């Protein structure tokens, strides 16, 4: 007998040993042994009471559903792993259905991306309203909402001096009336704001007012910018703390900010006004972009170079204004493009990188959080209603310009807020410079180079899609994806297309036709011909083919898979371990103490805990890499008269390494 080490033959299964240990092989050179473990040869001790067993190792752990709401993981019987979503009311923005970071109780109500869908009703995914271009414009334009004699109107202001209608009123039914034409205001409009039912308009040399509450409304010049002209794209004006506040840089680079009282008389020169303390000492050419308010202060913001910032101003009981104090400084290379105060406690920050939500304390100081979402083209406009805020984005909704909705009532574990894409200006790109809410919640927004887009009162978009996060069941092991179940209303009001999404393509699974009344359960074999570690699905909802006011609705879905990890084997091997043994050729081998020596050697191998090579010469001798899990020595005979005769049967339990 010889125990030697050798490398595996090229025809043998490759051995991958990450520990760097060297397993021992045994080559038969004399005695005909049955088995070798880590190079230690043995004769099989197979009997009725000590059989040789080889079985599949358990690969599914017993699980107890400890989620907040016990559900799919507590189901038994089918063997499926199930992942379902019955609501998407926490919006988009996840990559994985089982979060690498964050709160799993929130992630299960979110999806990856979407367009044209409204997820905000708990337990229901439906289509959004469509929008229509109602008034074209070649440059910038602004839109505001107002109420006159109980009726809602939109007020559109055109920047371009060549626009025939500089101020246009639109009713909820679409009736348009020009209020100010290009003979009344001949200069380029740099900024505009609504407040107290007054519309204030800023040109390079003048500040105009149009009061909708006047008996006979007409354009009136309240102020003259009688020093250097106001510089284009560096003017901000808004109605805060019961007054209009303007902040601007001149063409010569000076900076200033004024509180403007309503002036019904002759035009007042700015040179006679007192600037807000601190507004004249900002960097030359500072770009003012926003004025807004909270419960305890108002704020003036903008940027210098790549540094965005905002300043706080308070108003005392006499109406006097404090000195400007900086309360917001954005990270380097992030410009402040817009601010929008809401509910007295929040200030929305539109930046060159996206949107941040700032919270205001009782002293009017501001602390902001991380980016709620990123927008590579910046955010220039907001509006709000109830707990929702809408932000305008350029090419941010499926490559088109539109709105993204943020739910301030749904803070997330990452200190952000739930959000989702919303209304879209179809096939259009350009900055959104204003957003307004009118007519019981309808939205209107202006797109630079396009014009005024208004949400339709009843009609839905033709289709909308959402893509789920990647479903992995918290493991990268392969799965056999078997079934997809879809839940909808009893009668489907529009088609639903379902596809599997990969990194490079979307493979169509099926189309559920409008009018279908059955519940839907689909075999995934057509889009999963092979096992895969993960899955993602895209659902496309369509509008009703004959009624534009209704469309497909989804209540939820569930995906089912079976785990398919490489199976390990548990092998139970009985071995003779006596001082004297005979191999299958009749050769006598051993010596006194032979059994104890081999048992000790085998136990030493087990104690190291490394993988070992098991060779079963009765089954061809193919080497198997395994870990010894248990060694049991059974001795059922008494010692001889010399009180020796140590020996018995060793049962080795090993698990193959896969």
Where are these regions (language model features)?
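Loop/turn-rich, solvent-exposed surfaces of beta-rich toroidal or solenoidal domains
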Residues: 335-356, 372-412, 474, 483
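N-terminal beta-propeller domains
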Residues: 2-182, 198, 205-213, 236-239, ...
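Exposed aromatic-hydrophobic patches
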Residues: 325-326, 432-437, 519-529
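Non-cytosolic beta-sandwich-type ligand-binding/adhesion modules
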Residues: 5-11, 16, 33, 38, ...
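Repeated scaffold domains used in trafficking and secretory/extracellular systems
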Residues: 134-151, 183-197, 225-242, 279-295, ...
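Beta-propeller fold detector
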Residues: 177-182, 218-226, 268-279, 321-329, ...
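Extracellular/virion structural assembly segments
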Residues: 562-658
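Blade-level signature of beta-propeller repeat domains, shared across WD40, Kelch, NHL, RCC1
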Residues: 430-467
């Amino acid at each position: 007998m010889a125990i030697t080490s050798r490398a595996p033959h090229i025809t043998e299964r490759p051995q991958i040993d990450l520990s760097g240990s060297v397993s021992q092989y045994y080559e038969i050179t004399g005695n005909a042994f049955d088995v070798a473990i880590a190079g230690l040869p043995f004769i099989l001790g197979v009997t009725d009471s000590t059989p040789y067993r080889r079985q599949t190792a358990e690969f599914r752990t017993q699980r107890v559903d400890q989620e907040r709401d016990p559900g799919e993981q507590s189901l038994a019987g089918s063997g499926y792993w199930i992942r379902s979503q019955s609501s998407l009311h926490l919006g988009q923005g996840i990559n994985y259905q089982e979060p690498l970071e964050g709160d799993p109780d929130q992630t299960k109500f979110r999806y990856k991306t979407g367009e044209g869908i409204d997820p905000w009703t708990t337990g229901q995914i439906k289509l959004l309203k469509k929008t229509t271009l109602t008034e074209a414009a070649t440059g910038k334009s602004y839109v505001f909402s107002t109420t006159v004699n109980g009726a809602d109107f939109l007020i559109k202001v055109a920047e371009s001096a060549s626009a025939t209608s500089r101020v246009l009123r639109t009713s909820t039914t679409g009736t348009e009336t020009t209020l100010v034409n290009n003979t009344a205001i001949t200069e380029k409009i740099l900024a505009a704001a609504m407040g107290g039912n007054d519309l204030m308009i800023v040109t390079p040399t003048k500040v105009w007012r149009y009061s909708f509450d006047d008996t006979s409304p007409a354009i009136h010049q309240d102020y003259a910018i009688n020093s250097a002209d106001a510089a284009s794209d560096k003017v901000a004006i808004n109605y805060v703390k019961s007054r209009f506040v303007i902040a601007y840089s001149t063409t010569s680079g000076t900076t200033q900010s004024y509180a403007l009282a309503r002036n019904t008389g002759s035009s007042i020169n700015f040179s006679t006004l007192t600037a807000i303390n601190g507004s004249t000492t900002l960097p030359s050419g500072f770009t003012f972009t926003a004025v807004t308010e909270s419960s305890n202060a108002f704020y003036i913001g903008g940027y210098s170079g790549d540094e965005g910032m905002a300043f706080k101003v308070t108003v005392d009981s006499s109406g006097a204004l404090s000195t400007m104090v900086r309360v917001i400084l954005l990270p380097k290379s992030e410009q402040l493009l817009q601010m929008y105060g809401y509910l007295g406690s929040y200030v929305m920050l539109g930046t060159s990188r996206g949107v941040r939500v700032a919270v205001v304390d009782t002293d009017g100081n501001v602390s902001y959080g991380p980016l709620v979402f990123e927008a590579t083209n910046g955010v220039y406009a907001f509006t709000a209603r109830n707990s929702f805020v809408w932000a305008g984005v350029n090419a941010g909704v499926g490559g088109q310009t539109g709105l993204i909705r943020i739910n301030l009532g749904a803070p997330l574990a990452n200190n952000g807020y739930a959000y989702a894409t919303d209304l879209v200006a179809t096939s259009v790109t350009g900055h959104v410079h204003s957003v307004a809410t009118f007519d019981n919640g309808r939205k209107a927004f202006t797109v630079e180079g396009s014009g005024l887009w208004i949400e339709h009162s009843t009609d839905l978009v033709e289709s909308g899609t959402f893509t789920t996060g990647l479903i992995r069941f918290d493991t990268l092991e392969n799965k056999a994806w078997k079934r997809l179940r879809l839940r909808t209303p009893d009668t489907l009001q529009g088609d639903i297309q379902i596809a599997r999404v990969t990194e490079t393509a979307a493979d169509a699974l099926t189309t559920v036709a409008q009018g279908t009344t059955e519940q839907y359960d689909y075999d995934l074999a057509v889009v999963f011909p092979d096992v895969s570690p993960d899955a993602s699905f895209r659902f496309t909802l369509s509008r009703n083919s004959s009624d534009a006011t209704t469309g497909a609705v989804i209540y939820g879905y569930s995906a089912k898979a079976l785990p398919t990890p490489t199976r390990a084997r548990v092998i139970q091997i009985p071995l003779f371990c006596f001082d004297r043994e005979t191999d299958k050729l009749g050769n006598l081998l051993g010596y006194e103490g032979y059994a104890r020596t081999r048992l000790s050697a085998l136990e030493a191998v087990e104690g190291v805990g490394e993988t070992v090579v098991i060779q079963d010469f009765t089954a061809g001798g193919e080497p198997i890499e395994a870990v010894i899990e248990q060694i049991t020595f059974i001795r059922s005979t008494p010692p001889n008269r010399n009180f020796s005769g140590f020996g018995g049967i060793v049962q080795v339990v090993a698990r193959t390494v896969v």
